[in-house]
A protein has these predicted regions:
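Amphipathic alpha-helices that form helix-helix packing interfaces
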Residues: 38, 66, 128, 132-135, ...
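Short, contiguous, pocket-lining structural segments
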Residues: 131, 157, 161-171, 175, ...
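Conserved hydrophobic residue
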Residues: 51, 75, 264-265, 380, ...
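Glycine-rich cofactor/substrate-binding loops
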Residues: 2-37, 98-99, 280-459
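Acidic, glycine-rich loop-and-beta core segments that form the ion-binding/anion-interacting portion
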Residues: 216-308
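Short, well-ordered beta-strand elements within core beta-sheets of diverse protein domains
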Residues: 43-51, 120, 164-167, 236-244, ...
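A helix-coil-helix interface module used to build multimeric assemblies
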Residues: 1-202, 207-214, 220, 272-276, ...
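Conserved helix-loop functional segments at active or binding sites
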Residues: 145, 182-185, 189, 218-222, ...
Length: 459
């Protein structure tokens, strides 16, 4: 057990307790952030005259050699160390001697781990933003190619009105755009530097916290040392944002699974994103989409766990907070994997446009437009609604669509109908005349697509 502290104790830490407390098995992924933060801390200490320039250079060179050796596989992060902080410091002392013992001057593991977590989270938010943008670009590409691809829109999972594939994909664009904006907001709100807060009450050393913050790319130092070492709000916000991303992916997955079914046949998931049954050779299963849907609960669990962990913790730092890391790591890894997979699946998926259009015709999706036709000919809407309800009932009995009715059949139900009813209820007319902003009409969609392109240009 490699331990750098414990002079106050007269007994060795019980191995069971040591292993129970140790976090090296998971916080070793912080090694780059821990070294990055230590370099900035050392540069600040030298600037303030707390370290000599020679000591500064020795420590910086030693830290860089550790980083390089870990990256190249020459140095393994083993579980003989309690955490990543002790691993870095112990190896530094082994390499450069007494100068390495000065690394921790004016610093506590409390503000050190708070910094590491922020540096790591900041980097991962940037990566997540990139993956969300990839999704947005793929959605936009589908939208641009399908402004006139007619399909049924659904409410209550029943065919409702004709829309376009571009319009449907546009709904998901809006969702993931909000996700992207949420990630940007979290980054901005969390971008303050906790280093220099010490254990909870700052330090007696003359530290230049603003300089350290500047070196590390933060907007400035945190303003309360107790909050600095016990703040997990930004992680809760991130877990909430990741849960929302997964909720959107899960909804999308559910639709893809339904659309891919034999009953719908709206899409064909590429073989490279499908699996086959071990017993039924005819099966092509949408396992990728199903797993994305299934992993959503895992990310929800991370959010709930962190909230539950934090709810009863008094100020300032408590060991409970160590429990945040595995949850955050797993949630981030899960969401990154799901975003990348889903974007790839979407890029290779084929859309059955003819099937979508045919589904519209046989679902009475133009019934609302038939009612609007009557309203435009002077019939009160409530009466028009009842008349079209009778039309639908008639068609169901005859096993035909509204388009298949003769004019005589129309007139038997209402004399208001004329020959132009057929144009009024054609799927193309139903979609094309809906051109207010946000509607599925091609002209409306082109304006929205232009706005989306402008947004992505700024990403």
């Amino acid at each position: 057990m490699a331990q750098l502290w414990g002079g106050r104790f007269t007994k060795e830490t019980d191995k069971l307790v040591y292993n129970f407390n140790a976090s090296i098995s998971f916080d070793k992924r912080f090694y780059e952030q821990d070294i990055q933060g230590s370099k900035a801390h050392v540069m600040m200490l030298a600037k303030q005259g707390i370290l000599t320039d020679d000591e500064k250079q020795q420590i910086l060179d030693g830290l860089e050699s550790i980083r390089r050796d870990v990256e190249n596989g020459k140095l393994e992060i083993t579980e003989e160390y309690e955490d990543i902080h002790s691993f870095v410091e112990a190896n530094l002392i082994d390499r450069i001697g007494d100068a390495g013992k000065k690394l921790h001057t004016g610093r506590s593991r409390n503000d050190q781990v708070a910094l590491d977590m922020k540096l790591y989270t900041r980097s991962e938010i940037t990566a997540l933003q990139g993956l969300v943008v990839d999704m947005l670009r793929e959605l936009l590409a589908i939208m641009k190619d399908n402004t006139e691809t007619i399909m049924p829109g659904f409410t209550h999972l029943q065919k409702a009105q004709p829309i376009t594939l571009a319009h449907h994909m546009g709904a998901y664009f809006e969702m993931f755009k909000r996700d992207h904006m949420r990630l940007k907001d979290i980054y901005k709100r969390m971008n303050t530097c906790p280093l220099g807060s010490g254990a909870l009450a700052g330090t007696t050393y003359d530290l230049d916290r603003a300089y350290t913050a500047e070196l590390l790319g933060f907007d400035g130092p945190t303003l309360n040392s107790m909050d600095s070492v016990s703040d997990r709000d930004y992680l809760i916000e991130l877990m909430s944002a990741l849960s929302t991303i997964m909720m959107h992916l899960s909804r999308f997955s559910e639709e893809v699974i339904i659309w891919n079914s034999n009953e719908y046949q709206f899409v064909d998931i590429d073989d490279s994103y499908s699996t086959v049954s071990s017993i039924m050779p005819q099966k092509k299963n949408p396992d990728s989409a199903e797993l994305v849907r299934g992993k959503t609960g895992r990310v929800y669990g991370a959010l709930t766990s962190i909230l539950t962990t934090m709810k009863g913790i008094p100020l300032a730092y408590n060991k409970d907070m160590q429990e945040d890391k595995e949850l955050v790591f797993d949630a981030i890894d899960t969401v990154k994997g799901c975003l990348a997979l889903f974007t790839g699946m979407l890029a290779t998926m084929k859309f059955n446009k003819e099937r979508m259009l045919e589904s519209c015709r046989h679902g009475f999706t133009n019934a609302t437009d038939a009612a609007d036709y009557l309203v435009n000919h002077g019939v009160p809407f409530r009466d028009a609604h009842g008349i079209v309800g009778k039309l639908v009932l008639y068609c169901i009995d005859k096993k035909i669509a509204l388009d298949d009715m003769s004019l005589e059949e129309y007139k038997e139900i209402s004399p208001v109908f004329e020959e132009d009813i057929y144009d009024a209820i054609s799927m193309e007319t139903c979609v094309n005349k809906r051109n207010t902003i946000g509607a599925p009409g091609p002209e409306a969609m082109k304006k929205v697509i232009a706005l989306h392109e402008a947004y992505l240009e700024e990403c």
